[in-house]
Amino acid sequence: DLDVNVFNR
Protein backbone atom coordinates (compact mmCIF):
# COMPACT_ATOMS: atom_id res chain seq x y z
CA ASP A 1 0.00 0.00 0.00
CA LEU A 2 1.79 3.08 -1.19
CA ASP A 3 1.10 6.72 -0.44
CA VAL A 4 -0.79 6.69 -3.72
CA ASN A 5 -3.53 4.79 -1.92
CA VAL A 6 -4.14 7.86 0.19
CA PHE A 7 -4.76 9.92 -2.93
CA ASN A 8 -7.02 7.23 -4.36
CA ARG A 9 -9.12 7.40 -1.23
Curated annotation (Swiss-Prot):
Compartment annotation: Secreted, Cell wall
The name this protein goes by in its record: Pathogenesis-related protein
Secreted keyword on record: yes
Organism in which the protein naturally occurs: Ephedra distachya (Joint-fir)
Keyword annotations: Cell wall, Pathogenesis-related protein, Plant defense, Secreted
Primary location: secreted
Gene Ontology BP annotations: defense response
One annotated Gene Ontology cellular component of this protein: extracellular region
UniProt keyword Protease present: no
Sequence ranges assigned to domain Barwin in this UniProt record: 1-9
